[in-house]
Amino acid sequence: MSGIVTYGSYIPRYRIKPDEIARVWGENPERIKNGIFILSKSVPAPDEDVATISVEAARNALKRKKINPKEIGAIYVGSESHPYAVKPTATIVGSAIGVDFSLFAADYEFACKAGTAGMQNVKAMVDAGMIKYGLAIGADTSQGAPGDALEYSASAGGSAFIIGKDDVIAEINSTLSVASDTPDFWRREGQPYPSHGERFTGEPAYFRHVVNAAKMMMERMETQPKDYDYVVFHQPNGKFPTRAAKLLGFEEKQYKDGLITPYIGNTYSGSMMTGLSSILDVSKPGDHILAVSFGSGAGSDAFDITVTDRIEEMDRNKAPTIKKMLEKIKWVDYAIYAKYKKKIVLGDGIE
């Protein structure tokens, strides 16, 4: 059966606390933290973007498993903050890791589930015999307008999964998707920051799609919440995924290892995939995982995954674990954050 052969993630070391953002805008920091359950968020350095994050995540995946890059037949990078409007991120990644000229490559967009859409496609291509290995990446340097609620959560990071049939560490038993035209979050071409429906992003968008996708997967697999060792959802904040887990009947011990948004914020396309990476860092053979992404607009991808004995053969410490990256922090204030995120409009010739 096809599944995850190796994985890697990258989280920028720069962080800012919601308290600092609240201080600048005259907001109550305790109200903000209690409302979204985010204690800090990652900030990309001036030389970090979706391309560099994707390359680092892919290289970390290759550190854990010595795969010949020329055997990777497809690369799909999901993001809503690709560095170029016209020039693919996927080819940059391919060149950086040394893939062959014969390559399926594309950039995907579906808000925060573009990366998991890539996972589904490379799995289908592997199953069809079109490629030996496929690389799916979800990464973002997400945007939030100054003073907007999104500024407290929009962060940066990403994860890469190489999918194949040989030496699989986590079998993807099944995957499915749900989608509907739900205008909960959007950004038109040329606009620097997205707009959102505030509370409308909850019940009719996130919870409708995530909860139903999870239920449909459990119905298909004839499973119940108690049959899973771990569950991970898309994490726009710290509260939505915990509420979704409880609505479905999961316990804290099942979702706590994959819940990383309270420490790094919402990495958008990297969110659920990085939570899954965190679970794979600590999982053992036989562990059963339910993973559900979400993308505004709106849709969810669900995965039923079983960890194999091969994971014990992998030296997971050959690349930074999520725990290690969470511990590697350099704090910045709002001025540095605004500078790094290019929120300050400079005069001509000033850098």
Swiss-Prot record:
Q: Does the keyword GTP-binding apply?
A: no
Reaction(s) catalysed by this chain's protein:
acetoacetyl-CoA + acetyl-CoA + H2O = (3S)-3-hydroxy-3-methylglutaryl-CoA + CoA + H(+)
- Name the enzyme's class: transferase
Which UniProt keywords are given for this protein, alphabetically ordered? Acyltransferase, Isoprene biosynthesis, Transferase
InterPro entries cross-referenced by the UniProt entry: ACP_syn_III_C, HMG_CoA_Synthase, Thiolase-like
For the ligand ((3S)-3-hydroxy-3-methylglutaryl-CoA), the binding residues are C112, S153, T201, H234, R243, N266, S296
Q: Cite the EC number.
A: 2.3.3.10
Superkingdom of origin organism: Archaea
Q: Give start-end ranges for the coiled-coil region(s).
A: none
Q: Which GO terms describe its biological process?
A: farnesyl diphosphate biosynthetic process, mevalonate pathway; isopentenyl diphosphate biosynthetic process, mevalonate pathway
Quaternary data: Interacts with acetoacetyl-CoA thiolase that catalyzes the precedent step in the pathway and with a DUF35 protein. The acetoacetyl-CoA thiolase/HMG-CoA synthase complex channels the intermediate via a fused CoA-binding site, which allows for efficient coupling of the endergonic thiolase reaction with the exergonic HMGCS reaction.
Q: Which family does it belong to?
A: Belongs to the thiolase-like superfamily. Archaeal HMG-CoA synthase family.
HAMAP family in the cross-refs:
HMG_CoA_synth_arch
According to UniProt, the name of this protein is Hydroxymethylglutaryl-CoA synthase
Q: Which organism is it from?
A: Thermoplasma volcanium (strain ATCC 51530 / DSM 4299 / JCM 9571 / NBRC 15438 / GSS1)
